[in-house]
Amino acid sequence: YDVTGGVDFMANVRNQITRYWNDRDQDTILAILKGVFAMQATGTGNIKTANAAFVSEHTYDISAAGAASTTDAMKMDATTLNSAIQKACGDNKQRFSLVICHSVVATNLENLKLLAYLKYTDEQGIERDLGMATWNGRTVLIDDSMPVENVDAVEESGTSGESGYVAAQDAYTKYTTYVLGEGAISFEPVGAKVPYEMGRDAKTRGGEDTLI
């Protein structure tokens, strides 16, 4: 036991292990999604064409590559999510239920007052934020492991209106946000009847507890 806080030490260890594996599972999901949206360049023939078509239909890009500077239209706003899910699934857009985004994107949405935080009432009857937000009714998961691309500035070259002209462009940071529908990814238990257990060795060092 933690003599300073009265907290069960092994319970703390279990909680830390749970958080660790939750983070690993989240990393795995993001790696899978990154792979899915990279498949437009994979395969051959009809398969490559189908892969590219899927990625194109399910990607809503507001970065406006080639623009001279970053504008408000290149940032998330009140219409971005609705437009993106409509492009992907049309009248089935209501099936989307989870948004995964970078904290910079989430902060921008907060500043625009587009995120609504779930609330609960504590034992004193005071309503408090739960710390989990929704955007247009979709749960928002914030993770700084989301893909981030730093796009370099481009200097103007050539003459405007002539062949080979390249317009100037400011440097900017491009963030990727994923929106998932119900059943997009299934999480299945491995089937272990006892995923972990405690073992105690009373004869060693006055008694040791081991989490196995």
What label would you give each PLM region?
Residues 11, 15, 94-95, 205-209:
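Residues at beta-strand starts and edge strands
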Residues 22, 89-90, 110-114:
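Signal for well-folded cores of large energy- and translation-related assemblies
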Residues 2-87:
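Alpha-helical scaffold segments that mediate packing/assembly in large oligomeric complexes
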Residues 1-9, 85-108:
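Structured, hydrophobic secondary-structure cores that serve as assembly/anchoring elements
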Residues 51-83, 104-106, 110-212:
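Sequence/fold signature of self-assembling virion shell proteins
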